[in-house]
Amino acid sequence: MQQLQNVIESAFERRADITPANVDTVTREAVNQVIALLDSGALRVAEKIDGQWVTHQWLKKAVLLSFRINDNQVIDGAESRYFDKVPMKFADYDEARFQKEGFRVVPPAAVRQGAFIARNTVLMPSYVNIGAYVDEGTMVDTWATVGSCAQIGKNVHLSGGVGIGGVLEPLQANPTIIEDNCFIGARSEVVEGVIVEEGSVISMGVYLGQSTKIYDRETGEVFYGRVPAGSVVVSGNLPSKDGKYSLYCAVIVKKVDAKTRGKVGINELLRTID
C-alpha cells in the first residue's frame, strides 16, 4: 500500500503536466487501483481511529488525479446519456450483482464510480459523488446529495433534498462526516468538513458550515464544525453584541441518549423542543 501511496504522491506533485494523452502507465494503473478500492469499500478517505477521525489525504489526491488522466466519454444511463470523465458505478451491474451487494437503487439515482455503497442501503433518486462512503442501513432520500469523499455512517437517514458537502479542494480540508444513527432533516445542508456526531437529529432546513455557530441553549456553549453526539438541532438566531441585529445559528435544544432515541420517534424529538 505504501508503494501505491508513493506513486500517487509523486504524480500529484506534477499534476499540472499530466494529461490523458501523456499519463504514464504506472500512474494510470495506480489511480485506477485506488478508485477501485474506494469503490469496493476496501479503502475510505476518512476513518475513525482510536476515537478520532483521520483523513487520508493521498486518497483524495488520487481522486483528483483521476480527473487529470481521463478524457470525457459518452456514458449510457437508464434513461439518459452523459458526457463525463468518471464512469457510473452501476454501469456494468446485472441483477445478480445487485442481489449480491444487497442495496436498492431507485431510478434515476446516480452514483459515480469510486463511491462505496454498503448493504441494506436505499438510494432514492439522489446523487452520490466519487470517493463517498455510505455505510449499512442508510436511506439517501429523494434529491439528497452526498458530496465527494463524504462519509455517511450506519443507519443514517438523509431526508429529501439534503446536501452533504464534498471536499476535494483545498486538500487540507477534511470531508464532511455524518456518524452512525443520525437523522438529517429535509433541505438541510452540512458542508465544509463539519462532523455530525453519533445519534444526532438535525431538523429541517438547518445549515451547518465551519463558520456556523452551534449554540447549546442549556449550557451557553458555542461549537464550530462539530455537532456533539446525541444533539437535537434546529435553526435559530443569536443577537449581536449591540442588540441591533441577529445572525443565523444552529441551536442545540436538547440531548438524547440511545435509550431515549429508541423509545421516542424522530418527529416527537423535534416537536417537543420547548
Curated annotation (Swiss-Prot):
Catalytic activity: (S)-2,3,4,5-tetrahydrodipicolinate + succinyl-CoA + H2O = (S)-2-succinylamino-6-oxoheptanedioate + CoA
PROSITE patterns in the cross-refs: HEXAPEP_TRANSFERASES (PS00101)
Entry binding sites for substrate: 104, 141
UniProt-listed InterPro entries: DapD_Trfase_Hexpep_rpt_fam, Hexapep, Hexapep_transf_CS, THP_succinylTrfase_dom1, THP_succinylTrfase_N_sf, Trimer_LpxA-like_sf
Keyword Repeat attributed: yes
Presence of keyword RNA-binding: no
Family: Belongs to the transferase hexapeptide repeat family.
Protein name: 2,3,4,5-tetrahydropyridine-2,6-dicarboxylate N-succinyltransferase
